[in-house]
A protein has these predicted regions:
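Canonical tetratricopeptide repeat
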Residues: 279, 313-314
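Short coil turns that delineate tetratricopeptide repeat
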Residues: 271, 305-306
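Alpha/propeptide regions of enzymes that mature by internal proteolysis
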Residues: 26-193, 200, 222-255, 268
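Bacterial N-terminal signal peptides
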Residues: 10-20
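TPR alpha-solenoid repeat register
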Residues: 276, 310-311
């Protein structure tokens, strides 16, 4: 007997005939996790960046649906999701197989293809999508120049066309355009069950062989009443941290004026972020601009006293001058001095 908390299993029972195991194949107890959702895979023609973004009424959609590899492509695998489409699709595209042919091969080999929904885009911007005939309605996809949008278990069939139009008309970088697409899908009705999690991943158009440097953005909202809005907040915060990173890079190049501009931009984006204020101050102190740094140290100390305690520990790591007179002036801006 199905318990009330197991009612989500009911749709899976309809697909029991698909689960017969062929000789030599391992058993798959269900045709995949029921990650019914809407998503987009896309490429930025200006930068070559490739990405995927998704929202679902399913906990922690990020590890399941969106996949991307720099210089290779991106995949969204959903409906009764077979996660293998992600890594296997990327592996084929990495060997030079175009997205349409890669998807064709994987779909042909999948006995449960009728309940799958998958989209792929390769580094050249070629796209392909598959919506199985037994995906829960409303289900469908739309492809265009450098993108594919796909959705299933939607309120109605207007969701994915709305996503497509939004992506095509949106301004901004790839993250912004994909967010606009998700927002349009939700505004058009979205998942009939509601919403729970979201994710976005973007990689560079050319791989360096160092994946940790090639992943531009990977953000996830695991469980939230408005996951797209929360994802947008995280993207905004990511942009602020990128300003901080740019400031640090400018400091390394001894371009203090550029660093100040970047640090100031980050602080303006997220007022009250003591982390930004403190490291801005520390960078100025390192470059001999202590008079400018002291008010910033004071702000950081008032916001979070832990920064005051951290100051004496930093000279040994080269993050503040190893000069007792300078440290005394910095600490004088703290709560103990007040």
């Amino acid at each position: 007997m199905i318990r009330p908390d197991q009612r989500w299993l009911l749709p899976l029972l309809a697909f029991a005939p698909l689960l017969a195991v062929s000789p030599g194949r391992s058993a798959e107890p269900i045709p995949g996790r029921p990650v019914h959702t809407f998503s987009i895979v896309a490429r930025d023609p200006a930068t070559g960046a490739i990405g995927a973004a998704v929202q679902s009424h399913w906990f922690s959609v990020g590890p399941l649906v969106p996949w991307a590899e720099a210089g290779v492509g991106a995949v969204a695998t959903q409906s009764f999701v077979r996660v293998d489409y992600g890594p296997e699709g990327l592996a084929l595209m990495k060997k030079g197989v175009g997205a349409p042919e890669a998807l064709r091969r994987l779909v042909a080999a999948d006995e449960a293809r009728d309940v799958r929904q998958v989209a792929m885009i390769d580094a050249r911007g070629r796209v392909a999508a598959h919506t199985g005939g037994r995906c829960i309605r409303a289900a469908g996809h739309e492809t265009g120049a450098g993108y594919s949008v796909q959705a299933n278990l939607m309120v109605d069939a207007g969701v994915w066309p709305a996503m497509a139009r939004a992506f095509e008309t949106a301004q901004g970088d790839l993250a912004e355009r994909m967010l606009r697409s998700l927002e349009a899908g939700q505004a058009a009705g979205g998942d009939i069950r509601g919403r729970q999690s979201a994710a976005i991943v973007i990689v560079k158009g050319k791989g360096s062989g160092r994946p940790w440097n090639d992943r531009i953005m990977e953000l996830r909202v695991e469980d939230h009443p408005d996951p797209i809005a929360e994802l947008r907040r995280l993207v905004f915060l990511w942009r602020a941290y990128e300003e901080m990173n740019a400031g640090d890079l400018a400091i390394e190049k001894n371009d203090v004026e550029a660093a100040v501009r970047h640090y100031g931009a980050a602080e303006a984006m997220v007022p009250g972020m003591d982390e930004f204020v403190f490291w801005h101050a520390a960078a100025l102190a390192q470059k001999g601009r202590l008079d400018e740094a002291l008010p910033l140290f004071g702000r950081a100390f008032r916001q979070q006293p832990g920064w005051y305690l951290l100051v004496p520990r930093l000279p040994a790591s080269g993050l503040l001058p190893d000069d007792p007179a300078i440290l005394k002036r910095i600490l004088a801006a703290g709560p103990a001095a007040e």
